[in-house]
Amino acid sequence: MASVSAIGVLKVPPASTSNSTGKATEAVPTRTLSFSSSVTSSDDKISLKSTVSRLCKSVVRRNPIIVSPKAVSDSQNSQTCLDPDASSSVLGIILGGGAGTRLYPLTKKRAKPAVPLGANYRLIDIPVSNCLNSNISKIYVLTQFNSASLNRHLSRAYASNMGGYKNEGFVEVLAAQQSPENPNWFQGTADAVRQYLWLFEEHNVLEYLILAGDHLYRMDYEKFIQAHRETDADITVAALPMDEQRATAFGLMKIDEEGRIIEFAEKPKGEHLKAMKVDTTILGLDDQRAKEMPFIASMGIYVVSRDVMLDLLRNQFPGANDFGSEVIPGATSLGLRVQAYLYDGYWEDIGTIEAFYNANLGITKKPVPDFSFYDRSAPIYTQPRYLPPSKMLDADVTDSVIGEGCVIKNCKIHHSVVGLRSCISEGAIIEDSLLMGADYYETATEKSLLSAKGSVPIGIGKNSHIKRAIIDKNARIGDNVKIINSDNVQEAARETDGYFIKSGIVTVIKDALIPTGTVI
């Protein structure tokens, strides 16, 4: 996203919307600033920066009641009035989540944000990429469970001088730690941030951007932050429009005519659910879509002004552990300005095996996937691995995504996602499945030794059939194995046998061995 210093012409549009009293505010005449980036001196850039800031503040002063606009994730027509050096004024804080029990066994040996996604990526790449695409390059990731692989991935994927040495960008993991002042591990999202406030306040920023590490979506945080500043909010909560069917599974919010949050309800039902209906046209939906989506749910994504965050966590709610259920409703009760900001794009909370499975298979959807990794205007970044192209020999592959470095021989793959370095042998059938691949290749010598010992190499063996399953990394699936859940078992824990079944989806554990001839 271009900074102001890289834009040749900046137009500040007239503002003539009505305020809450019904009186039209004074229109601000359109002003155009023109300059050439190739000849603009350093002093001129500083002057331009301050001029843009004054113009933006002028618009806000004359228009005190501004409702945050509809946020469309792939919109190309936005113009923000953010500080050109946005990365220095916002600190990104990504919450890595707890033990990830609902995603077990995928979280058996890794933190939830480190779970592989979409053949080439990991979950953590989504919020980090959204930050980088929004010119936010100072990012912390808070975690306390199995953080080794997450730390390794981040150190390899994101350079220590992101954004250039001037911006001092970084992506750094902060693991839970005990100290004489606080002997406890993280007790929740708010407590995790509280324990590292001493570090966060060292950064001279205006806002903290609080993000979740297990969501799949593409969002322009610059628009989010712009709306926070324009409404003079203390806290801004990203909100997702909901229909009645889905609304009962989320924490809902009620807003007034200015988009200010006045009430919260956790997974309401019946009459309580009906009472949470809102006019979502206030936040930018058209009349038809507002009728279909009369509820707004919190996405667990917040912009919090720096001083407000410090006061809430240290003074107002020193014992609160969670943002969504304690701190944010508490801030509303104190009379702070807590605004809703509508995000009307694809969003998925990847907190369960079923949600994770559906999100991955969703990228194979025709003609347009639920989430696209092919948007060059807002790319998803990850670790460069320098793997060779995938090799497919007499393979029949349809409606699938194949990662880098795979070797696929004379097999059938349909509606599946195949991860890095996957090896699939002759006669295998892969349907409606997610294969995470492998961390390394085995040599021919190693495979011969395994065969001599009666063991199985990494990958999918000959004539094996995999259907509606997740195969974690480095799994060894023997020949003539059937993982098809023909009995339609919904829940089963067979950890000693190398697999679990959740919501009818078979998940083979990382590094597991499924012997030749096994039927699941």
Swiss-Prot record:
Gene3D superfamilies in UniProt: Hexapeptide repeat proteins, Spore Coat Polysaccharide Biosynthesis Protein SpsA, Chain A
Xref: CDD domains: ADP_Glucose_PP (cd02508), LbH_G1P_AT_C (cd04651)
Primary localization class, coarse: plastid
Alphabetized UniProt keyword annotations: Allosteric enzyme, ATP-binding, Chloroplast, Nucleotide-binding, Nucleotidyltransferase, Plastid, Starch biosynthesis, Transferase, Transit peptide
Domain of life of the native organism: Eukaryota
Reaction(s) the record says it catalyses: alpha-D-glucose 1-phosphate + ATP + H(+) = ADP-alpha-D-glucose + diphosphate
Expressing tissues: Leaves.
EC identifiers of the protein: 2.7.7.27
PROSITE patterns: ADP_GLC_PYROPHOSPH_1, ADP_GLC_PYROPHOSPH_2, ADP_GLC_PYROPHOSPH_3
A Gene Ontology term for the protein's cellular component: plastid
Entry keyword Transferase: yes
Annotated NCBIfam families: glgC (TIGR02091), PRK02862.1 (NF002772)
Recorded family membership: Belongs to the bacterial/plant glucose-1-phosphate adenylyltransferase family.
Protein known as: Glucose-1-phosphate adenylyltransferase small subunit, chloroplastic
Species annotation: Arabidopsis thaliana
